Amino acid sequence: MKEQFVAKRIVNIGLIFLVAIGVSVIAGMMGRMYLDQLLGMGALTVLFMVLFAFLLIYERKRKKISNNRETDYGKILKGFLLSAILTVIFLFLPEFTSPVMILPILMSAVGTYELAVCSSFFFCTVLEMAKGCQSYEILCCTMLLLAGFMITHMLEDTRNKMWYLILIFAVAVLIPVLFSYFFYQEPHYDILGKAAIGAAVTDLASAFVYPFLTKQKEAEIDNFLTDITEEDYGLLRELKKFSRQEY
């Protein structure tokens, strides 16, 4: 059967593209970048989004997004927009205190592991470029993302969820504190307190937002199974044309 081109799917990819451009422009302006730097960040964003769009299409064709080849990327758009909003909020936070571990956790709830990895690193790249961060904060951000990627799959194990939430809190506090010590060569207790607040927010998102988004993703599967039984469903019409017996 032929590939179905769905207008809503194209619109949602376009909106994801606009969100990426928007967060890059906002971050660049808040970081007081020069015009040439803004243009450079815009070019990087366009390059990333072209690759991200192809990855979306590839993951959809493999039925990796909600086990649904006919997904319209609506859940991906919501997760991407939420991640962009969080990235803008992180711009106001002091160094070493941005709870970026929340990004892969949220994106994996609405999409796939691959999409979570790519989008999270994109948002962190925009964040660090806008803040003009030094190498230790970039490494701190990277370590938090890696921790988020590793913990994401564990959250599906509801029986041991409390232990994973404790682990998330500990990691989200210790990594910023350690990297800030490497940079300043002395302890900063204000960073400890702010990192603890960020860790608590990450825990809350893992405990409540992650399962909520996961249930929405599962509901998309149920809606898909209902839709394919309808007479006006596109692929069902194609099957009817192709083989009356199979229909």
Roles of regions detected by a PLM:
Residues 120-122, 166-247:
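Acidic/His-rich, divalent-metal-binding segments that scaffold phosphate/diphosphate chemistry
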Residues 14, 42, 76-81, 102, ...:
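Hydrophobic alpha-helical transmembrane segments
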Residues 31, 37-109:
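Hydrophobic transmembrane alpha-helices
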Residues 100-116, 150-155:
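Generic transmembrane alpha-helix motif of multi-pass integral membrane proteins
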Residues 29-42, 90-98, 129-138, 158-162, ...:
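Membrane-helix interface and helix-disruption motif detector
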Residues 12-25, 78-84, 141-148, 164-180:
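Hydrophobic membrane-spanning alpha-helices of multi-pass integral membrane proteins
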Residues 2-17, 72-76:
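N-terminal membrane topogenic signal
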Residues 124-152:
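Interfacial aromatic-anchored transmembrane helix boundaries in multi-pass membrane proteins
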